[in-house]
Amino acid sequence: MVDERTPLKAVTTREDAPTAVMRPKPVGKSIFALSILGTLSAASISLFSMYGQTLQHKLGFTQVQVNSVSISSLLGMYLLMPVIGYLGDTYGSNYLALFSWITFPASYSIASGIFSTAADWHRETGEALPRAAPEMALCFFFIGASTSCMYYASLKASAHSMSVYFAEDGKLQTYTPGYAIWGPVAAFGLSSLWQSQLLRAVFITGKNVNVAGIFLFFAGLYAVICGIIFFSCRTAESMASELRKKAEASTDCNCDGPGHEGATLKEFFTDKTAWLFLLCFVFIGGPFEMFQNNMGAILDTVTVENADSPSFSTHVSLFATFSTVSRLVVGFSSEAMESHVSRPVLLSVIALVAACIHLMVPSGIFTVFDNAKYFSVVTIVNGFSYGSSFTLVPTIVTKVWGIANLGTIWGSFILALAVGSLGYGLLFAKVYDAASEVGVGSMSQVCSGVHCYGLTFVITGTGLAFAAAAVFFIWVFMWKKRGIHM
């Protein structure tokens, strides 16, 4: 019989149902809730823009130095993700939680001290403290790494806490419900919302930003939350190990190590659908990252007559709101409609809608017609699609390759996203700079008009359409034939 990895209710209704089903203990629900709490607190790194310029004003940093601090955090978070995932898969996610428990509070505490010392130096001398920028960059590198460790540890604990183990055809099988994956992912998206509101209410007064206070707050927060996640991971892994042993002992099970929870790394990297799906994620995630990072530049190209220019802050809020809403809506709906609409089909439809919008942007209907009145449509669709992809893709990854090497595999997808973000970001910059030299505003670095971004959106729209078709093809002609249900 083919390994179908179907939902457990489908498995247990068959005549040849498994002889024993090992369901999570009641404590599993508590671990799941604590995992949600972990990712709901993990996205402090995304708030850098709220205090980044204060480093320039109060510490005398150049813009290059400010950017170096921000880039260091991204390097720690994205580039180390596959390594962090591999270490978690091999040695246990509790070690990653322990690492974040140590480095998160320590890095933020040290950063607070550096800020206070550098601020005093700048007030007295009018110059930047020479060692402040590299030291701050090093702190934020570890903050980025701690973010990935905490995120992955929470995700793996959630997966273990809700997974069901059963023996079928002499082999141990695992079923992980979709909400055990998209739940923590959606919570991570919500994290920056409540944290940003708290910072505005407590640490920001007008243009005055209490950066040292912000750093100390996060140091205290993570000293508590990371400790909770550490003990949750230990409990989750212990419970999962016990359930596996009971399922193995319940029948004549020919189990050969951790592969029964999903694909081995060799199986993943030799699976041609893995590389195709990675490529699809580059073409899906890259355009949304590009739009998010260059939204201000796009809005600056819009020329309006007798009207106010579109508000950048309004569109940032729209993007964030619909990104968050989509994580919840798509997460719940994909779970509820699992037996009717598969997640790859849902991802294809969302990518196709986004492709249509991107291909319509060069026409000027959203940016030129009626003083850019309908530009919000572009923002909403990109925000919704961005959040949806971060809900659907990790769930699909789990359904296809299991949770045995979830950290390494999902880390590879995060790395693919970084490649897409970099590639499409460079594309936007090249098109923008080329247009500014020949179009309106050619005497300055500022570009105005559709030609500043038209070619970029044609390419992103085409890439999204290709990815939508490719995901649908992979699902219908490859995954479905393997008997994978999602």
UniProtKB/Swiss-Prot annotation:
GO molecular function terms listed in the Swiss-Prot or TrEMBL record: transmembrane transporter activity
Topology with respect to the bilayer: Multi-pass membrane protein
Protein name: Probable transporter MCH1
Similarity comment text for this entry: Belongs to the major facilitator superfamily.
Lipid metabolism as UniProt keyword: no
Pfam families cross-referenced by the UniProt entry: MFS_1 (PF07690)
Location in the cell: Vacuole membrane
CDD domains attached to this UniProt entry: MFS_Mch1p_like
Keyword Nucleotidyltransferase tagged: no
Lineage: superkingdom: Eukaryota
One of the record's GO cellular component terms: fungal-type vacuole membrane
Chain coiled-coil ranges: none
Main location: membrane
Function of the protein: Probable transporter.
Transmembrane segments: 31-51, 68-88, 95-115, 135-155, 174-194, 211-231, 268-288, 312-333, 349-369, 377-397, 409-429, 457-477
Keyword annotations from UniProtKB, A to Z: Membrane, Transmembrane, Transmembrane helix, Transport, Vacuole
